[in-house]
């Protein structure tokens, strides 16, 4: 009766019970005769497969040594080739506790599974799952190896946070993706004192890491940080903590910068924003004498023991000088009460008028000037009648000059200006029928042209006035000073053609003037 092919379980049983065959050459084992047990050449080759080491080499090796060869050594070839997971052996377990090694980013973290550097217990479980059948069954070639399903790794942010809190517990074991031979040189240097490498948070932007990193980890940074990163307590306190209002006394400190510590802030602010008050004990005459002496004295004499505010006040007066050096009380008076060059106050008493930027005088003032009341103070008193010629011929103030065109006024006053002598003033008064439009416009024009022709604040005619109410009001109050003593209004029925002619001429000249000014401005640009 012929025997059929032997089942696989019987072949395992025969291998376990039969003694090891006698050592014979490899070629003989491959092509020799069947064994005494009646095994076929294929079965004999299967039995003696674990004894083959290479052609021409001896296979005399005990079974215990063969089994021990399956144990992982300090440098695992399977780890270096990337075919199997690896866990730290007895050679490098102590050194890895002192100097952790960064994993070479050869694959994305999700594909490598949970790194043993994060959880030691998980690495032990992986090692146990892979190598738990070594001691139970010696014939590993007939069993199929299955990798453990990888799980989601922890994010970098969590690794950094827990690594700082737990110390070296996170890096107690070497990561599987780094070969053991790469730790040989670094571990020896790390054992020396002063050569320990501190753990630093690493980023793929760093030049040293970009050379070795293949870019897989950058794809997972954003997702890991969104899901696993928690808000720090310091940031949470910004939303939950109550608001605290703190008032800083910056103004007080700024005020006390040049003051004594005992000085109050209110008095300092008052001294900064307000003009220094004059002492009640000083008389106007005494202060005037003191100012004159300081203005003409040397720097040594000016540094006399006085109040600091008075010294600053006197220095400002000495710096500002008029053509004759007679500017006084400039800080004690309102600039609006000073004439155009700020050298002195107005001579006449002014009244309120239609235009606030101009000074108006009453008809009685002009009457007093014509009567010679201010002869010792005035060198020249000029009255400019800005009405049209037919109005001027119908009645005007004695001594007035009829100039209704701006170019005529500029030719009369500014081409050959009147120079004051002996401290006497030159006063110019403008008026029209009501002193509401033509007179004020002519007064502004003269001041504007005078400013352009002189260095500020010097002026040829610093004192200008406008007659309040115009010629109509002057005629009603002071008819005796009018020649002829009559009044002809602008809208007279007999002079409609003259009115139309002069108005057209004035508007045309005004338009040409505006064009000339526009051209001059364009040339300056």
Curated annotation (Swiss-Prot):
Domain Rhodanese, first and last residues per copy: 377-483
Chain span(s) of sequence motif Phosphodegron: 73-83
SMART domains registered for this protein in UniProt: RHOD
One Pfam family of this chain: Rhodanese
PROSITE patterns referenced in this protein's UniProt entry, alphabetically: RHODANESE_3
Superkingdom in the source lineage: Eukaryota
Molecular function GO labels: phosphoprotein phosphatase activity; protein kinase binding; protein tyrosine phosphatase activity; protein-folding chaperone binding
EC annotation from Swiss-Prot or TrEMBL: 3.1.3.48
Enzyme class: hydrolase
A Gene Ontology term for the protein's cellular component: nucleus
Reaction(s) this enzyme catalyzes, per UniProt: O-phospho-L-tyrosyl-[protein] + H2O = L-tyrosyl-[protein] + phosphate
In-chain residues carrying the UniProt-annotated modification Phosphoserine: 75, 78, 81, 87, 106, 123, 177, 279, 293, 322, 514, 520
Keywords attached to this entry: Cell cycle, Cell division, Hydrolase, Mitosis, Phosphoprotein, Protein phosphatase, Ubl conjugation
Notes concerning its domains: The phosphodegron motif mediates interaction with specific F-box proteins when phosphorylated. Putative phosphorylation sites at Ser-78 and Ser-81 appear to be essential for this interaction.
Family as reported in the entry's similarity comment: Belongs to the MPI phosphatase family.
Protein purpose: Tyrosine protein phosphatase which functions as a dosage-dependent inducer of mitotic progression. Directly dephosphorylates CDK1 and stimulates its kinase activity. Also dephosphorylates CDK2 in complex with cyclin-E, in vitro.
This protein's name: M-phase inducer phosphatase 1
Organism of this sequence: Bos taurus
Top-level taxonomy: Eukaryota, Metazoa, Chordata, Craniata, Vertebrata
Name of encoding gene: CDC25A
